[in-house]
Amino acid sequence: MITNQQFNDNIEEFISIMLANLKLKGTDFEFSVNNNYVNKWNIDKMYSFVSVSVKQLRIDFTISFDDLYGVPLLNMRLYDNDTFLTSPMAQRTLAVGICRVDLHNHHLLQQPWLQVHPCETLQTIDSHLKNTPTCKYNSVIQYLCCWFGLYGLPSIFPQFSVRPNIYINNVQSCKIK
């Protein structure tokens, strides 16, 4: 479990690690990061914005902290040839992963975005992090890497993979999946 303040203190480092380790697997297509930044929303809320493109598809996503569930939250918008896919059905057609995804108003930006539902995230991440090896990063970065692997972009688009080796060198097979 992490707090909003811990999220705020670590989001920039996490985004840097995530972008350095984001891969597109099982395809010859390349992807590009068009834009990324971390923004302070108000006195105590921060979020990151990342935009990636694969051929004509653009995925804009934010990572923020949801106070109600006490977990990070992924919101995204999809574009085809720079045309915003406004219909929820068109959005759902392209989001083919295993997480529950709904169209909601972004809790900070107050515009319609697809949202990976945060239900059960807290328990899932806590159980994944039980008995983990010593991490070469702080525990918040470890938590965010685990969360992103399970509930972030790869959960919706399994072609994306992020597998940073966050553990101390001599530990075998400890990459976040």
Swiss-Prot record:
Membrane topology: Peripheral membrane protein
Natural source organism: Candida albicans (strain SC5314 / ATCC MYA-2876) (Yeast)
Gene encoding the protein: ATG10
Example of a GO MF term: ubiquitin-like protein transferase activity
Stated name of the protein: Ubiquitin-like-conjugating enzyme ATG10
Role, per record: E2-like enzyme required for the cytoplasm to vacuole transport (Cvt), autophagy and nucleophagy. Acts as an E2-like enzyme that catalyzes the conjugation of ATG12 to ATG5. ATG12 conjugation to ATG5 is required for proper localization of ATG8 to the preautophagosomal structure (PAS). Likely serves as an ATG5-recognition molecule.
Biological process per Gene Ontology, one example term: autophagosome assembly
Pfam families per UniProt: Autophagy_act_C
Protein family per UniProt: Belongs to the ATG10 family.
Active site: C135
Subcellular location: Preautophagosomal structure membrane
Top-level lineage group: Eukaryota
Signal peptide per UniProt: none
Gene Ontology CC entries for this record: phagophore assembly site; phagophore assembly site membrane
Keyword tags: Autophagy, Membrane, Protein transport, Transferase, Transport, Ubl conjugation pathway
Coiled-coil residue spans: none
InterPro entries cross-referenced by the UniProt entry: Atg3/Atg10
Subunit structure: Forms homooligomers.
EC id: 2.3.2.-
Induction trigger: Expression is decreased upon fluphenazine treatment.
